[in-house]
Curated annotation (Swiss-Prot):
GO BP terms: telomere maintenance via recombination
Key word tRNA-binding present: no
Gene name tied to this protein: YRF1-3
EC main group: isomerase
Chain ranges of the Helicase ATP-binding domain: 861-1038
Biased composition (Low complexity): 1318-1461
Region (Disordered): 1318-1485
A GO cellular-component term linked to this record: cytoplasm
The protein's name in its UniProt record: Y' element ATP-dependent helicase protein 1 copy 3
A molecular function GO annotation: nucleic acid binding
Organism: Saccharomyces cerevisiae (strain ATCC 204508 / S288c) (Baker's yeast)
Domain Helicase C-terminal: 1095-1244
Length: 1859
């Protein structure tokens, strides 16, 4: 029997072997490789090339095959291919699974065409509605013909839908996971084809459902967390005994990850009625509760406040299994085992899952290029499944807690059955996870390490990783050091951390009492904290928004390497949440400094709840220094850069908000500030802690030399193994030491009892000191083994003592005794006399010359000589400022040494003026000295400016005393030195008796620390100067007087500046000229000083409207009274000593810079140092002025002018106060000045009077002319007995109306402008005395004047007949006295408006000629309508009296009545004398007109000051504050009126400059850039910052300003700073490319390399493609702009045959290109002519550059070996760029692929960007526009696999990357 059985088995085996051979033969016949290139698979011919398989057409390729292959395939059956070829649908079904397994698949979108009913593929030309209806399929592409492509999709043969759901083979994994089948039974979850169509909605809108799930969970959690405290708890896998609260505290990032994990299951819930897996629920009986999915979809929309009440009720019903709702939750929980594709990235553990399981989905992943997955993957891994269940539990607990009365359903003992089942599922999954997490770890003694899952992990691995992170930290630090003087890590460690004077003794967590709101920063003395902050470098601009952003980004980036350094330095690893929550302050603080070892110690908890005892881990010295540096320096820099308005962080439950009475009222700004001052590792850009996704990126690249990289979990297990096996114990208590190591690694010793032989151990089982000691020993062992201390060299003997660093501050005693220093000979930097000349050219231009030889020699003396102290006396207006300004600029140009100088002035009002003057042209960085006193030297400022009080302050003295030590610590160099100490008007030290007590502190200043001291004054003779210098502690003047020509260098400077006599240079004596001779000085005794002063001011402003004046009053009360009474006449600024310092500075600056301010009123403090160009008059009302104050006041008139000293008659009895100089005396002012300066007296001699006592011989021509004009005006006023009140009228009227003619008139609006201006200028003065100019103007501009004059004297009937049809008699008489031109003007245009203007401008001469030559008929007519008196006067004789009567009666009132009713006579209501009005009466009767004119004038001056026009090239970018080099590349060329949409700033019939009525015109004479043009450019700037939709909304928002460009400019200027910052931020990349020419490399664009073949092409290939495209366009005569706009290949032969630009544009307009462009694209947001005018002269520079490059293109074609073809001419090239600019689809893809560029919204910027060069894949340079054309071609190419790119998916991916 046994033999028979064996024979039977042998026969069966032979049969099976034979069958197997037959099957193999059959398969070989069906799938036969017939050659090296082709394969036959199921009716298709597949071509193999480079391991790529492609379906081809046999008929096309048969001639390319071998003869034997062709014979074999001729017999093959290609019916399947023929079927696909003949199918009209783009999507063709294919049942061959072998084909889909052999050929790469892709995902494409398809839609059903409504017209034909065919299935078509989605292309870029597909409409939006078809896209919305599209669906995705996994397909294989087939080229069935030339440019004909079909797509095969797998469909099984005749599926039987009646037999039930189709088992999904995509859910059967290759590696069986028993748990998901036995516990979750995933094999029973079967989906039919309808289900897959429904599930495709989820993949198409995954982002939406991610957001929906997150919002729902967030809302539920907020409501659940607000419930009153509930005592119920639930047991967890990690805390199975005591349990945790049911509603656990979750971070917002955790809620977001949970929400993303829940997205597929939320989708299932919302579609329970459609999916077949819920068949049990769908079979519910009538009356049972159903889920209203439509209501759920409405309530849970993430775009609005989420309403979760109904959702909460559904969740409660599912938990309680009401009706059949429990079946829904049951299915959803089982579906958790399914992998619905790529979930949220960035969670801790994702990478471990991929590494551990090595799972591969059945369907090849097509998610690598950002494409959506439309099929389910293999089941979830245990770890991912556990995370999903975590999310489900959180959602169920939170949602049920929203409406449930209590949470008993979640009770461990009495809870509902559903919850118990969930707990069982979770526990089983957790146990499975523990099994999966077991790592294969083996010891590798040879390499001093271990093997983790076959990957070597040893000390070299850790050290390589650590020092790579340290190098990354240092590199980022260097970037900051380029902009700042950054202290090094060693500097800060030596100065503070290692300094034993700084104590860090404080209680710590787990050892002593815990203190809230503590930080080790509070333990650092303030004097150290002030000097650790870095200072800006000299070559760096001020803290701009771009620089602040650079600081925050750099510090965010270096946070991650620091985290890794800590991770490796502690040795016993952290879980990521523990590392993430390290805090150096606040209630969750866990970072401390050990006072003994000066190392950083970390106290962290085992889990997030902090339920276990803290673990102590000590860092090594090197890492401690870096952590300390990060907290004390870098974080403080980051806080300063972010500013007080930073509010990116939101309140999160994990965050303890302390210090607020009501935490619910805490704003995001408060939260952000708490976080910045507490937590270490932040992502300030996103407003969150550093995410795991960012942290783990380093694992993929580091260490560089490791062949295999470990993931985070493997690395954690490897660190634990290293601690166990490689780091040995050296103590007697080995058991405790080993157990401590396990606890520090966050392991429970209970889990290792088999290893250690103990059942339990915790640090509470030993004393607190022992616990600390054990943990410190464990850290010490790790540090010693890793060897970080051997790389850390901290030589305390070589580092400076902290006492030396702050010696200056410590040495300052209560008595402020001066610090004695050892003076030395100062090192000299190479200087040249040419430096001063270069500095002058920088400041004043290339034509700079010195005033005289004295000024040149003094500048050289100050700059070149070794004289330590110099005093200069020069007359006011000489240019004393330039004596130190030019040397300061020369010092600043020295790159090897940084000089910091100080300037002090006597009064606060001089600060603003000095800073404006000294900072012009950007030659010096100037700042207030207060900044230096409060913050120290910033490393950028060249000159600090302050007042005498600052010079005398203790803080300033102390900072100067400690200068060298602090600078060496802060800037790590000795090349930052103190430069000049400059004191202006130093005579005040002696003359200001009442302030001498304030100057006492100056004597404590260490003058020896400065390079040189310079003392300047215009009123300091030798006696005053010597006394002033001695009063501040200096030696005084040199005993031997020095001449300016003596430029000997002192050889011995060892005594120091303070003990060296000051050398005096007295330019007044040298020149022997009396100062102030250029000013006309007048002494007047008057009855009323204010009244006389007002007369003088009004007269000055009538003559010189743009001039300014200063009035010096005697008391503060008088200052305020004058300001109140004069402000109705002109704009006034007043200042006196009772105002605050800031207010004084602000008002002085306003007067100097605001051109509309006329008068500065103040006490004598306004007489010193102020330089005002328009100043023409100084009036002094102070009776107590001494000679110094007089000279200083008159000295403000730099270029000449008038000075009036007004005193009351018989009241000059002022006495000098004790110790002060006596007041000036009555008499010759020049002689008193000579006496003061010690000049030779000329009393009684020739030349005694210089600019005084009526002498004009030494005055300038302009000053003499001004005096004469003032005298003439005074005589005129005296003759007419004019009142003071009337004086401003002419001045105001001329400004408001007469000037309008100069700049408001235009050709099309000339008549209206003339008439309006004529009416406005009607007044008594004009009529009473008509000058020749007016008459000529009237006769030339319009000859209707004469006619209207006749009509005034004629009845209404006559006037009408004349206007409508002038009879022969009247016309003849008129033409006799009027030229032919006048007659023509009358006959052609006679209107009411003309009559008005004529009536008001009739001259006496015209009236006489008209009256004497009017025909008898007319005279009779006139007589009949004229009063007897007038008739007699007129008819009897035309004499002067009659003329005067006629002229005087022509006034505003008469004109109005004449125009209203022509029947009324001009002199009807009285005789001529009664109608003669005085000018004052006339103005008073027209108060409304005068007020209106005043308002226009005031508005005009305000606008002129606010929007100055300095040149014709002025643009709005200058107004925003951009530098010239930035404006060059952001310049808004091509922006004109056509840029504005129709109706925006385009009104007609108004002033072209301001779009206002001509009588309200606010334009000013000489304005070079109109307000309307500035408004166009401002609108363009707003367009720069907005996309199309945002710009549309913006145009709607500014609709009130569409007709008011001036109002819009005001609205725009309010956001000036914000707009500037936004442009700097949004266009930083653009400026980097266009201005700094940073290179764009396609290889740096990851998305480009993955998503486009163009980015993998060489430069040669791109150029060939570019030339090929243009060759094709030229051959086909395709319309270029339309083609690049939307790939429409319309013909336009005229475009290619056009000879010039005009014909070219006409051709485009003829075919309707511009019209289509406006209707289809964003070009509709501009004017109708905007695009058309781009072909004119807007882009001349770019055109010239392009035409010069045509030769280069020809050479390129020859080099490429292609036939030279014509490259496009300029107009075609510009058409291409405009088309690409308006092609939204193309631009979206280009911006997605080319990561170095972003969006631009202005065509000029696009054109500039297109012409930059990029590096192709082979590092050859090509213009960007060639790359653009290649990408454009790829988008239109169906034969490029990656050519068709879904823009919606592009944007989703970019948003995901951004998040």
């Amino acid at each position: 029997m046994e033999i028979e059985n064996e024979q039977i088995c042998t026969c069966i085996a032979q049969i099976l072997h034979l069958l197997n051979s037959l099957i193999i033969t059959f398969l070989d016949d069906d799938k036969t490789e017939t050659g090296q290139s082709f394969v036959y698979i199921d009716g298709f011919l597949v071509k193999k090339h480079n391991n790529q398989h492609t379906i081809v057409n046999f008929e096309t390729y048969k001639n390319k095959m071998k003869v034997s292959d062709r014979r074999k395939f001729e017999k093959a059956n290609f019916d399947e291919f023929e079927s696909a070829l003949n199918n009209k649908n783009d999507l063709v079904h294919c049942p061959s699974i072998t084909l889909f397994e052999s050929i790469p698949t892709e995902v494409r979108s398809f839609y059903e065409d409504e017209k034909s009913g065919l299935i078509k593929v989605v292309k870029f030309r597909t409409g939006a509605m078809d896209r919305k209806r599209s669906f995705e399929k996994i397909v294989v592409s087939v080229m069935v013909g030339k440019n004909v492509q079909k797509f095969l999709t797998f469909v099984e043969d005749e599926p039987d839908f009646q037999g039930g759901p189709i088992p999904s083979k995509y859910l059967i994994p290759k590696k069986i996971n028993l748990m998901v089948y036995t516990l979750f039974q995933v094999h029973t979850l079967k989906f039919n084809r309808k289900d897959y169509d429904t599930l495709s909605l989820f993949y198409l809108n995954r982002g939406y459902y991610n957001e929906l799930s997150f919002r729902v969970l967030e809302r539920c959690y907020e409501i659940a967390s607000a419930r009153p405290n509930d005592s119920s708890t639930m047991r967890t896998f990690t805390d199975f005994v005591s349990g945790t609260p049911i509603v656990r505290g979750l971070q917002k990032s955790t809620i977001r990850k949970y929400g993303y994990n829940l997205a597929p299951y939320m989708f299932l819930l919302l579609h329970v009625d459609e999916l077949s897996i819920f068949s049990a629920y769908q079979a519910s009986l009538p009356g049972e509760k159903k889920v209203d999915t439509e209501r759920l979809k409405r309530d849970l929309c993430p775009r609005k406040p989420t309403e979760i009440k109904y959702f909460s009720q559904i969740c409660n019903d599912m938990m309680n299994k009401k009706d059949r709702l429990g079946d829904i939750l049951h299915i959803i929980l089982r579906a958790c085992a399914l992998n619905f594709g790529a979930g949220p990235r960035g969670g801790a553990g994702d990478e471990e899952d991929r590494s551990i399981t090595n799972e591969e989905p059945i369907i090849p992943s097509v998610d690598e290029h950002g494409l959506k997955v439309c099929k389910l993957r293999s089941p979830n891994t245990p770890r991912r499944l556990r995370k999903t269940l975590d999310a489900v539990k959180a959602l169920l607990v939170s949602s049920c807690a929203c409406t449930a009365r209590d949470l008993d359903i979640f009770d461990d003992n009495n809870g509902v059955a559903m919850w118990k089942w969930i707990k069982i599922l979770y526990h089983e999954v957790a146990q499975e996870t523990a099994l999966k997490d077991s790592y294969r770890i083996t010891l590798v003694p040879s390499s001093d390490g271990v093997s983790v899952c076959g990957k070597l992990f040893n000390r070299e691995y850790v050290r390589g990783f650590y020092f790579a992170c340290k190098a990354q930290f240092d590199n980022l630090w260097e970037e900051l050091n380029d902009c700042f003087y950054m202290p090094t890590v060693v500097d800060i460690a030596s100065l503070i951390l290692r300094n034993r004077e700084v104590l860090f003794r404080e209680p710590k967590r787990g050892i002593d009492e815990y203190l809230e709101n503590d930080s080790f920063l509070q333990m650092i003395p303030v004097k150290y904290r002030e000097i650790v902050l870095p200072k800006l470098r000299r070559d760096t601009n001020k803290m701009t928004a771009a620089l602040k952003n650079k600081v925050t980004v750099a510090i965010d980036e270096l946070t991650v390497p620091l985290m890794w350094m800590i991770h490796f330095a502690v040795g016993y690893p952290y879980r990521y949440p523990e590392l993430q929550l390290l805090a150096f302050a606040g209630p969750q603080r866990n970072v401390y400094v050990d006072d003994t070892t000066r190392r950083i110690q970390l106290y962290t908890d085992y889990n997030k709840n902090g339920s276990s005892e803290p673990r102590l881990k000590t860092l090594d010295g090197l890492t401690s220094d870096y952590v300390f540096y990060f907290v004390t320096v870098l974080r403080q820099m980051q806080i300063c850069a972010l500013g007080n308005s930073y509010d990116a962080f939101n309140h999160d439950p994990w965050m303890d908000v302390v210090g607020f009475e009501d935490p619910d009222q805490v704003t995001n700004r408060d939260i952000s500030r708490i976080v910045l001052y507490s937590y270490m590792f932040l992502n300030t850009a996103k407003g969150c802690l550093v995410e795991y996704a960012t942290f783990r990126q380093y694992m993929r690249e580091l260490p560089k030399n490791a062949p295999q990289k470990l993931n985070f979990r493997e690395m954690r297990q490897g660190l634990i193994a290293l601690g166990r096996h490689c780091v040995g114990s050296r103590f007697e208590t080995d058991l405790y030491e080993s157990a401590t190591s396990e606890l520090m690694a966050n392991h429970s010793v209970q889990t290792g009892r088999n290893i250690y032989g103990v059942d339990s151990f915790s640090l509470t089982s030993v004393s607190g000191t022992t616990a600390t000691l054990l943990q410190e020993r464990a850290s010490e062992r790790w540090i010693q083994w890793l060897g970080l201390e051997s790389d850390y060299h901290c030589s305390f003997s070589s580092t400076r003592n902290a006492e030396d660093v702050v010696a200056g501050e410590a040495a300052s005693s209560d008595h402020h005794q001066k610090i004695s220093r050892v003076t030395r000979k100062r090192p000299r930097e190479p200087k040249s006399t040419n430096d001063i000349l270069v500095a002058g050219q920088k400041l004043f231009g290339s034509s700079f010359e010195f005033r005289d030889l004295h000024q040149l020699r003094l500048c050289h003396e100050i700059y070149m000589a070794d004289t330590p102290s110099v005093a200069v006396q020069a007359p006011p207006g000489y240019g004393k400022t330039e004596l130190f300004h030019l040397p300061l600029i020369a010092l600043a140009s020295k790159g090897d040494v940084k000089y910091v100088s100080f300037l002090f002035v006597p009064y606060t009002v001089l600060l603003a003026n000095c800073m404006i003057r000294l900072s012009r042209c950007g030659c010096l960085n100037v700042a207030p000295v207060r900044n230096f006193i409060e913050e120290g030297c910033d490393g950028v400022t060249d000159l600090y400016v302050g007042i005498y009080d600052d010079l005398a302050s203790t803080n300033f003295t102390d900072r100067i005393a400690a200068w060298e030590n602090i600078v060496e610590c802060t800037f790590r160099t000795n090349n930052v030195k103190l430069g000049y100490l400059i004191v202006d008007e130093f005579h005040n030290f002696e003359t200001e008796v009442y302030r001498q007590s304030q100057f006492g502190g100056i004597t404590n200043l260490d003058f020896d620390a400065f390079e040189k001291a310079i003392f300047l004054s215009g009123t300091a003779p030798e006696a005053v100067a010597d006394a002033a210098l001695q009063r501040i502690g200096l030696t005084g003047l040199a005993k031997k007087s020095m001449d300016i020509n003596e430029l000997k260098r002192s050889e011995d400077l060892s005594r120091g500046l303070s003990s060296y006599p000051t050398r005096m240079f007295n330019l007044i004596k040298e020149k022997s000229e009396v100062p102030l001779g250029h000013v006309h000085k007048i002494w007047k005794k008057v009855e009323s000083q204010p009244e006389e002063a007002l007369k003088l001011l009004l007269a000055l402003f009538e003559i010189e409207p743009e001039s300014k004046a200063i009035v010096v009053a005697s008391t503060t009360n008088e200052v305020e009274e004058l300001a109140c009474s004069w402000r109705k006449y002109f704009r006034v600024v007043w200042i006196h000593g009772k105002l605050g310092a800031a207010e004084k500075v602000s008002r002085t600056k306003e007067f100097v810079t605001d051109g509309s301010m006329r008068v500065l009123i103040g006490t004598k403090l306004v007489t010193e140092g102020i330089d005002i160009k328009q100043l023409m008059m100084v009036i002094m009302l102070d009776n107590r002025l001494n000679i110094i104050e007089l000279i200083q006041g008159v000295g403000r008139l730099r270029d000449g002018g008038l000075c009036y000293l007004l005193s009351r008659k018989n009241s000059w009895a002022a006495r000098n106060r004790k110790g002060e100089l006596p007041p000036i005396k009555e008499g010759c002012i020049t002689e008193q000045v000579r006496e003061f300066y010690g000049l030779e007296s000329k009393k009684g001699k020739k030349g005694q009077h210089v600019g005084c006592c009526g002498s004009r011989t030494d005055l300038s021509a302009d000053t003499v002319e001004l005096i004469e004009r003032m005298d003439r005006l005074a005589e005129k006023q005296a003759t007419a007995s004019m009142s003071i009140v009337a004086l401003p009228s002419s001045f105001q009227e001329s400004n408001s109306s007469d000037r309008c003619r100069k700049y408001c008139s235009s050709d099309e609006d000339s008549d209206t402008c003339i008439h309006g201006s004529a009416n406005a200028s009607t007044n008594a003065t004009t009529n009473s005395s008509t000058n020749a100019t007016t008459t000529a103007s009237t006769n030339v501009r319009t000859s209707a004047t004469t006619t209207a004059s006749i009509n005034v004297r004629t009845s209404a009937t006559t006037t009408e007949s004349t206007n409508s049809s002038t009879n022969a008699t009247t016309t003849a008489s008129t033409n006799v006295r009027t030229s032919a031109t006048t007659t023509a003007s009358i006959n052609v245009r006679t209107s009411a408006t003309t009559t008005e203007s004529t009536n008001s401008n009739t001259s006496a001469t015209t009236t006489e000629s008209t009256d004497s030559n009017t025909s008898a008929t007319t005279t009779e007519s006139t007589d009949s309508n004229t009063s007897a008196t007038t008739t007699a006067s007129t008819n009897s004789s035309t004499n002067a009296t009659t003329t005067a009567s006629t002229n005087s009666s022509t006034n505003a009132t008469t004109t109005e009545s004449t125009n209203a009713s022509a029947k009324e006579d001009a002199n009807k209501d009285g005789n001529a004398e009664d109608n003669r009005f005085h000018p004052v009466t006339d103005i008073n009767k027209e108060s409304y007109k005068r007020k209106g004119s005043q308002m226009v004038l005031l508005e005009r001056k305000k606008l002129k000051a606010q929007f100055p026009n300095t040149s014709e090239n002025m643009n709005v970018l200058q107004f925003l504050g951009f530098r010239s080099d930035e404006i060059k590349h952001l310049f808004l060329y091509g922006i004109d009126v056509y840029f504005c949409p129709e109706g925006v700033f385009t009104q007609y019939g108004l002033c072209k400059g301001c779009q206002k009525m001509f009588e309200l015109c606010v334009c000013w004479a000489g304005q070079k850039v109109s307000y309307r043009r500035m408004a166009w450019e401002a609108l363009a700037v707003e367009r720069m910052l907005r996309n199309d939709e945002e710009y549309k909304e913006y145009l709607e928002d500014i609709e009130p300003y569409h007709g008011d460009p001036v109002g819009y400019l005001k609205y725009f200027s309010v956001k000036r700073g914000e707009i500037y910052s936004q442009i700097q931020r949004n266009y930083a990349w653009y400026l980097a490319i266009t201005r700094r020419r940073e290179t764009i490399s396609v290889l740096d664009s990851t998305r480009g390399k993955q998503g486009s073949q163009v980015f993998r092409m060489s430069g040669r290939q791109i150029k060939e493609l570019y030339y090929k495209v243009w060759s094709n366009l030229r051959e086909s005569k395709t319309e270029v702009l339309q083609y690049f706009l939307n790939w429409d290949e319309k013909k336009c032969r005229e475009e290619w045959e056009a000879k010039d630009d005009t014909v070219f544009v006409e051709a485009l307009e003829k075919v309707g290109v511009f019209q289509r462009l406006r209707s289809m694209t964003s070009a509709g947001l501009q004017g109708p002519q905007y695009v058309k005018l781009q072909f004119s002269r807007h882009h001349r520079q770019l055109r010239s550059r392009y035409e010069l490059s045509l030769g280069m293109h020809l050479r390129d074609q020859l080099a490429l070996g292609v036939t030279p073809s014509k490259v496009p001419h300029w107009t075609a090239f510009l058409s291409m760029l405009i088309g690409l600019f308006c092609n939204k689809t193309f631009r979206q893809k280009l911006e997605y692929l080319l990561e170095q560029i972003s969006e631009v919204w202005l065509l000029p910027h696009w054109l500039d960007l297109a012409n930059v060069e990029v590096l192709a894949a082979d590092n050859t340079r090509v213009p960007l526009y060639m790359l653009m054309v290649a990408v454009h071609k790829e988008l239109d190419s169906d034969d490029v696999p990656d050519g068709r790119f879904d823009i919606l998916l592009c944007r989703d991916s970019s948003r995901e990357v951004g998040e």
